[in-house]
A protein has these predicted regions:
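Active-site-proximal cap/loop segments of hydrolase catalytic domains
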Residues: 1-152
Length: 152
């Protein structure tokens, strides 16, 4: 499974709650809602919560993918722009480091230099696709690989 921004949050959340997928890619995610509040350039996050994080820290914790990182067994790649102000790279770094510490699955952190919340440079757009294809190809089962005919 794969998602970016809000979809990146959902991807990280889902792999913390199921073993259904063979691989996942979480792009530009919010991983820790509590720390996100003080590092993002946006304020739309507040409409998803009833209170500020210092007023109800538990609500922010249970809605954060980081809270469920110990459950993740799906190989998960995390991809973010180094200059992203909407979902700062610190969110991706926090998740990547936690996945490494838990040691239950393979993980990779891809940092896009000088990129913001979307990739502006065509070379980075192409690079994203190459990373995605390589990651998902790596975790396809042998049976599904045999089912796909080779291109000549």
């Amino acid at each position: 499974m794969c998602g970016g921004s809000g979809g990146g949050v959902l991807t990280a959340w889902i792999v913390g709650h199921t073993e259904r997928f063979r691989a996942a890619v979480s792009m530009r995610p919010v991983i820790n809602w509590h720390s996100f509040v003080g590092t993002t350039d946006g304020n739309n996050w507040y409409h998803q919560f009833r209170k500020y994080p210092w007023e109800d820290p538990l609500e922010y914790a249970v809605r954060s993918p980081l809270h469920y990182v110990a459950n993740v067994t799906t190989p998960t790649m995390v991809m973010t722009g180094e200059a992203d102000l909407r979902t700062p790279i610190s969110q991706s770094e926090e998740y990547y480091r936690a996945l490494k510490m838990v040691r239950k699955t393979d993980t990779l952190l891809v940092r896009m230099p000088e990129e913001f919340h979307g990739w502006r440079r065509p070379t980075h757009q192409l690079l994203q696709q190459l990373y995605l294809m390589a990651w998902f190809e790596k975790y396809r089962t042998q049976a599904s690989k045999a089912a796909v005919p080779a291109l000549d």
